[in-house]
Amino acid sequence: MMIRYASYFIAALLPLLLFRWFAPASVGEIDFWLLWLVAMILVSLPVVYAEIALAYRSVDAPLAGMQKLTREADASPIWRSFGWLAALVSIVIAALVISGASTGILAALIELNSVPAIPSFALAAGLMVITILLSLLGVAPLPIGLGLMVVGLLLGVTNGLPTIDFAMTDINLSEWARAVALALVSVGAGTGLYWFGQNLVTKQVVTAVDANTQNSARNRAASEYRASKLVLPIWILQLVIGVVALLLSGMSLPPIGQLLYWVGVLFVVSYLLHYSTQQLAHKFGLLISLVATFVSALILVVAV
């Protein structure tokens, strides 16, 4: 049941996870809101449509599916690099977020006068170990992470909402760039997360053993869905949560709220590591992929 809603959890979590780093200094700029809405229509919506369509067409995960589709279309092998790039980008995003979580947790502990007697890089490495272990649970940590993040934000709301003065300002290139960046963040920056989520649903539906029955079952599974029926709810959820995330981007959280928020972030980021591990497992096997993902992310976390 949880697998079926993985894409919706991701649609809700990505804005909450990443918008705080991309939000404008003043979220009251009406022109920025309009630019972001245009970017959501022109960038986010087509990307989600494309990922769902590719999931239907390939009936496989992004890395294996892209290799399959390029062979069938006799396309340039360079397109096969998309799957590898998606796995790499997921690891990089996870490492950056875990590094940010380490800083946030340390700041909250300082406010609580409970600073651990360990170096900051050791704390980041410890959080990395916890996150990679959580990644073994697959989709299960997503609702837990969402719940913790929401509770943390609600504790911030009890201290008062940030004051926002809405005004129309001049449109400039940096606003366009920020609006497009937020739209890309909403869809995971092209990591193929929605493609992967739809593939999980398809694999869950397919339960037959022999090849012929399996193929027919997959065809039936694909025919049960329509692209718009899946894409529009995901896109609307991205839009609604994105608005909330932008409005709350300037809000300060109390120490306990910060701890809950960042612990929830670790649960969410574990899914990114799970995703990258599953992609690499297509080529190297699960154990080697898990170790490679852990080592790569750990190096990035400590380096940052």
What is each of the regions a protein language model found here?
Residues 1-22, 47-52, 56, 63, ...:
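Membrane-interface "cap" regions at the ends of multi-pass membrane proteins
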Residues 1-2, 30-37, 76-88, 136-149, ...:
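Alpha-helical transmembrane segments and their helix-start/interface "positive-inside/aromatic belt" motifs
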Residues 1-38, 162-171, 235-255:
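Transmembrane helix-boundary motif of multi-pass solute transporters/channels
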Residues 5-8, 36-41, 73, 77-94, ...:
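Hydrophobic alpha-helical transmembrane segments of multi-pass small-molecule transporters/permeases
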Residues 19-32, 51-60, 164-166, 201-212:
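Membrane-interface helix-loop junction between the first two transmembrane segments
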Residues 23-27, 62-88, 93-143, 157-181, ...:
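Inter-helical loop and helix-membrane interface segments of multi-pass membrane transporters/permeases
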Residues 35-70, 196, 272:
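Juxtamembrane transmembrane-helix boundary signature
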Residues 141, 150-304:
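Membrane-embedded translocation segments of transport machinery
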